[in-house]
Curated annotation (Swiss-Prot):
GO terms for cellular component: cytosolic large ribosomal subunit. The gene is rplL. GO terms for molecular function: mRNA binding; structural constituent of ribosome. GO terms for biological process: translation. Homodimer. Part of the ribosomal stalk of the 50S ribosomal subunit. Forms a multimeric L10(L12)X complex, where L10 forms an elongated spine to which 2 to 4 L12 dimers bind in a sequential fashion. Binds GTP-bound translation factors. Pfam families: Ribosomal_L12, Ribosomal_L12_N. Forms part of the ribosomal stalk which helps the ribosome interact with GTP-bound translation factors. Is thus essential for accurate translation. It comes from Clostridium beijerinckii (strain ATCC 51743 / NCIMB 8052). This is Large ribosomal subunit protein bL12. Keywords: Ribonucleoprotein, Ribosomal protein.
Length: 121
């Protein structure tokens, strides 16, 4: 069987069949195809958005009280004063990536308390 024949056979498979094929390949070769599974879920539609478990916290704007915002950014990120100030001055900037929904919402609330605008993506 040639590479082209294999690709053609894969093109003709349903999403369910492709999922089973990926699992079989993972077991056979002892590898993980996590990125391929995520890509397959995105093709399926809105289900991927509902299953999202990691979120990014983005500082959209610092508001009027930059000093307090810088302090909160330092607390959230663990960065030094200079780095935190650069993030606040350069908003919109991503503060944290790949955090849980609860953690992301807590960060957003802390930023809102000091007048900043943050987004959870």
């Amino acid at each position: 069987m040639t590479r082209e024949e294999i690709i053609q056979a894969i093109k003709e498979m349903s999403v369910l069949d492709l999922n089973e094929l990926v699992k079989a390949c993972e077991e056979e070769f002892g590898v993980s195809a996590a990125a391929a599974v995520v890509a397959g879920g995105a093709v399926a539609g809105g289900a991927a958005a509902e299953e999202k478990t990691e979120f990014d916290v983005v500082l959209a704007s610092a508001g009027d009280n930059k000093i307090k915002v810088i302090k909160v950014v330092r607390e959230i990120t663990g960065l030094g004063l200079k780095e935190a100030k650069e993030i606040v001055d350069g908003a919109p900037k991503t503060l944290k990536e790949g955090v849980s929904k609860d953690e992301a919402e807590d960060m957003k609330a802390k930023l809102a308390e000091v007048g900043a605008t943050a987004e959870v993506k």
